[in-house]
Amino acid sequence: MKSIIDVKNLSFRYKENQNYYDVKDITFHVKRGEWLSIVGHNGSGKSTTVRLIDGLLEAESGEIVIDGQRLTEENVWNIRRQIGMVFQNPDNQFVGATVEDDVAFGLENQGLSRQEMKKRVEEALALVGMLDFKKREPARLSGGQKQRVAIAGVVALRPAILILDEATSMLDPEGRRELIGTVKGIRKDYDMTVISITHDLEEVAMSDRVLVMKKGEIESTSSPRELFSRNDLDQIGLDDPFANQLKKSLSQNGYDLPENYLTESELEDKLWELL
């Protein structure tokens, strides 16, 4: 499958006189339609990397190619039209007095008719389950509802790439599951490429590949299953998945379980076989 993002030998530091790089000579790609999770400890370079991809920061060296176009100062605004970002705190993204005004805001500079704008706003809000709240003030929404509205604002723009920068980190477990389910549906309906920066295991499990960053460099790239089989997850800012913890406990008590990582549903099926 063709890559929609190619990052080659990318380096960046926030201050020219600092003796270390925040992102150091990284190279990776993202396939069209893929869900890539980026994980690692705070300060490992995750958020800096996606801000470089979106053109919010300018690299010191290396190149970024988005859908065949090399990112430059001249085309950064055109390339940004292909990318939508949702951040950790949705309050920083709200500009409209109502939910529907906020979702419509980004469409106003696209030369769309009022009818098309209204259609896109309602489709996006329906997709994230927030159509009934379109007249509500954003400040009166819960954290999970605010994040869904923020995603609706991005989806209405029809970007090819959706970047979630720790978008689920401030939500409770139920809110996280709902938001991850929403993103899963959007990806399927719009064939969207997703990059998520996260510490959430459920979010990582939904992805096709996982890129681990450490001290500004790429430590490894693997499938979620391969990642969860590692014994050093705490060293890269992740907890051991519950299914892994349970499997280890059961194995210690005499249950013959396979060595490879099992999802919770796979573990449940295996236990039924053993009982």
Curated annotation (Swiss-Prot):
<comment type="similarity">
    <text>Belongs to the ABC transporter superfamily. Energy-coupling factor EcfA family.</text>
</comment>
<dbReference type="GO" id="GO:0005524">
    <property type="term" value="F:ATP binding"/>
</dbReference>
<dbReference type="InterPro" id="IPR003439">
    <property type="entry name" value="ABC_transporter-like_ATP-bd"/>
</dbReference>
<dbReference type="Pfam" id="PF00005">
    <property type="entry name" value="ABC_tran"/>
</dbReference>
<dbReference type="InterPro" id="IPR050095">
    <property type="entry name" value="ECF_ABC_transporter_ATP-bd"/>
</dbReference>
<feature type="binding site">
    <location>
        <begin position="40"/>
        <end position="47"/>
    </location>
    <ligand>
        <name>ATP</name>
    </ligand>
</feature>
<dbReference type="InterPro" id="IPR003593">
    <property type="entry name" value="AAA+_ATPase"/>
</dbReference>
<keyword id="KW-1278">Translocase</keyword>
<keyword id="KW-0067">ATP-binding</keyword>
<comment type="function">
    <text>ATP-binding (A) component of a common energy-coupling factor (ECF) ABC-transporter complex. Unlike classic ABC transporters this ECF transporter provides the energy necessary to transport a number of different substrates.</text>
</comment>
<keyword id="KW-0547">Nucleotide-binding</keyword>
<dbReference type="GO" id="GO:0016887">
    <property type="term" value="F:ATP hydrolysis activity"/>
</dbReference>
<keyword id="KW-0813">Transport</keyword>
<dbReference type="GO" id="GO:0043190">
    <property type="term" value="C:ATP-binding cassette (ABC) transporter complex"/>
</dbReference>
<dbReference type="InterPro" id="IPR015856">
    <property type="entry name" value="ABC_transpr_CbiO/EcfA_su"/>
</dbReference>
<keyword id="KW-1003">Cell membrane</keyword>
<keyword id="KW-0472">Membrane</keyword>
<feature type="domain" description="ABC transporter">
    <location>
        <begin position="5"/>
        <end position="240"/>
    </location>
</feature>
<dbReference type="InterPro" id="IPR027417">
    <property type="entry name" value="P-loop_NTPase"/>
</dbReference>
<comment type="subunit">
    <text>Forms a stable energy-coupling factor (ECF) transporter complex composed of 2 membrane-embedded substrate-binding proteins (S component), 2 ATP-binding proteins (A component) and 2 transmembrane proteins (T component).</text>
</comment>
<dbReference type="InterPro" id="IPR030947">
    <property type="entry name" value="EcfA_1"/>
</dbReference>
<protein>
    <recommendedName>
        <fullName>Energy-coupling factor transporter ATP-binding protein EcfA1</fullName>
        <ecNumber>7.-.-.-</ecNumber>
    </recommendedName>
</protein>
<dbReference type="GO" id="GO:0042626">
    <property type="term" value="F:ATPase-coupled transmembrane transporter activity"/>
</dbReference>
<dbReference type="InterPro" id="IPR017871">
    <property type="entry name" value="ABC_transporter-like_CS"/>
</dbReference>
